[in-house]
C-alpha cells in the first residue's frame, strides 16, 4: 500500500507541473487580451515558468540528495500550491509573471525529487515497473492541461487554471504524511555547495533567457548575444569552482562516465527534436488547418494515452530485457511520425492524415519514456539520483528551447521566402510589399495592408497558409532528424554500470 502511495504522489507532482504549463499556453491569448498587454509581455507569463524550471532543476536535484527526497518534494508541492493561489489572485501582468516565476521554481524542486523518490523506494529489480507506473500516472494528468485551459477560457476565466491546482496540492500534501522513508535512499552528508548552486542557476538562466529571446529577436540581437556571453562566462567559473572546491555540487569526474555523457547528449537530441516538434503542433492545427483552440489542444491526447497504456508493460520488460531495444524502437517511431507530419498539406484532416503521424509519435513516446527515465536517474549512482534527475530534466528543457529557437528561425525563413515569391508574381506595390515583410514574424496571423484589392488579398491569403505549412514541414523534418540522431547514442547510453566504469 505504501509503495502505491509513493507512485501516486510522485506521479501527480510530476504531472501537475507539466499540465499547468500546457494549460497556461492554451489560455495565453485570452490572458493577453484580458490584461490588454502586448505579445512580448504575454509570452513572459509562460516563459518565466520555463526559465525557472530549467535553471533551478539541477540545484533542486542536488538538494534532494542532501536533504532527502520526501522533504524537498513536500517543500516543492507547498510552494507550488501557494504560488498557484498567487497566480489566480493576480491583478496585473507583473504580479502574474512574478507568481509564475515562483511556480516554476517550485516545479524545479518537485520534478527531480519525484523521480529520485521512486528510485529510492523500490529495489533495482522493480524500478522499471515502478517508473512505468509513475510515467502512467504523470501522463494521465498531462492531457488535462490543454483541455482545462480551453474549458476555463471558454466557460469561466483563466483564473480557474490556477484555482484548480489548490485542491490537488492539498490532497498531495496530506498523502505525503503516509509516504514511508525510502528504503534505498543513500542521502549524502557533504555540505551543500551554495556557490556552485548559484553559478549553475546563473549559467542555465542566462542561456535559457538567450534562447527564449532568440526565438523572437533572432541570434543577431545584442541582448541575446550578451545573455549567451554571460552564460558562457558563468559556466567557465562554475567548472573552475567545481574543480577546486572540497565538496562540489557536480563532481567533474562524473562527466567522464560514458553512460552519463551519452544519456545527456541523447536526451538533448531526443527532447530537442521531439518536444520542440510538438510545440508547433497546436499552431499547425489551429493556424494551418483551421481547427479550434480546444481541438488543437486535444490533438496530442493520443501521446499521453499511449504513455499510460505502454508504461507499465514497458517497465516490466525493461526489468527483464534491458532498455536497449526500447531506446532504439521509441525514437525511430517518433522520428517516423515527425517525418510524416513534414508532408503536411492544406487539405489534410486530423483523421486520418495528421492522426497517422500523431499515433507514431505516441507509440514511440510510450516506448522510450520509461527506460530513458530509469537510466537517467541511476546514471550517477544511488547517492546522486536527485542530481542525475535534475541534470537530465534541465537538459531536456534546454534541448527543447534550443530546438524551438532554431526551428522558429527555419519557419520564419521558409515563410518569408515563399511570400516573397508570391508577391513577385502578384506585382504588389513597393509600399505594400515592405509593410508585409516588416510584419512577416506574425506568420499565419499576418495581416494585409488596407490598400490591397480583394483578388490580391485572396491570393496572398492562400499563399500565407501554404507558406506557413511549408515552414512547419521543414520544422518537423528537422525535428525528425534530431530524434534519429539520438539513436546512435544508444550503445553507450545503455551501458551497464560495471561496463561504464571499466571504460
Regions found by a protein language model. Give the residues of each.
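Helix-loop-helix hairpins in multi-pass membrane proteins, especially solute transporters
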Residues: 57-195, 222
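Central cavity-lining transmembrane alpha-helices of secondary-active solute carriers
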Residues: 47-61, 111, 115, 301-313
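Hydrophobic transmembrane architecture of multi-pass small-molecule transporters
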Residues: 397-491, 503
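Extracellular/periplasmic helix-loop-helix junction of adjacent transmembrane segments
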Residues: 27-56, 95-98, 294-298
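Interfacial helix-cap and linker-helix signal at transmembrane-aqueous boundaries
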Residues: 31-32, 63-64, 148-156, 211, ...
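C-terminal membrane-cytosol helix-exit motif in multi-pass small-molecule transporters
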Residues: 166-185, 202-212, 230-244, 489-494
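12-transmembrane solute porter fold
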Residues: 7-26, 39, 45, 195, ...
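Hydrophobic/small/kink-forming positions within alpha-helical transmembrane segments
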Residues: 54-55, 85, 140-143, 147, ...
